[in-house]
Swiss-Prot record:
Assembly description: Part of the 50S ribosomal subunit. Contacts the 5S and 23S rRNAs.
Described purpose of this protein according to its UniProt entry: This is one of the proteins that bind and probably mediate the attachment of the 5S RNA into the large ribosomal subunit, where it forms part of the central protuberance.
GO molecular function list: 5S rRNA binding; structural constituent of ribosome
Source organism: Pyrobaculum aerophilum (strain ATCC 51768 / DSM 7523 / JCM 9630 / CIP 104966 / NBRC 100827 / IM2)
Stored InterPro entries: Rbsml_uL18_euk
GO cellular component, one term: cytosolic large ribosomal subunit
Similarity section: Belongs to the universal ribosomal protein uL18 family.
Keyword RNA-binding appears in the UniProt entry: yes
Record protein name field: Large ribosomal subunit protein uL18
A Pfam family recorded for this sequence: Ribosomal_L5e
Keyword rRNA-binding in annotation: yes
Keyword annotations: Ribonucleoprotein, Ribosomal protein, RNA-binding, rRNA-binding
Amino acid sequence: MARSGRYKVPFRRRREGLTNYRKRRKLLLSKKPRLVVRKTNKHIIAQIVVAKPQGDVTIVGADTRILAKFGWRGDENNVAAAYLLGLVVGYKARARRVEEAILDIGLHRPAPGARVFAVLKGALDAGLKIPHGEEVLPDEDRIKGKHVAEYAEKLKEENPEAYKARFSRYLQRGLEPEKLPEHFEEVKKKIVEYYEKKLAKVAAQ
């Protein structure tokens, strides 16, 4: 309950933990498209959004379910999937002639190496120009899922039943988690080849 005349009731979306208006204002003042990254319990979502007088307009967007199109059989909410999603959305943005953006992670805590920054790394590798500090990006081994592969290999040796339970989704999809880095590279190659062809067609128009 307010006890002071200076007390201000926060905006509803701020109260509900949905919007940081101070951060949003800074993003809008940049006048650049925003790479908006959000997470759910199962998936990661990335969009290129521009602010218009009537409200935000999404130019391109996707979530990690799109990775199945390129044969992805890993989880849809890990660092590797986040990177591949950023790669896809970065290429999709460039196909729409968007060449630069600014990262918008909403209320996510900006922990170095986090999934939101894996999306950023993917978009950068697709050719988007986005201001960032190198220290926030996950390293190459983590992006490829090497830590997952090493943990899976160790667990398989020490506790096969726990291994089957922990990685049941991978195994149901026909992927041995120890081979995640190799699988990652295969899917990344498919994404790059697919969208480079699209960009070549756009450039020829």
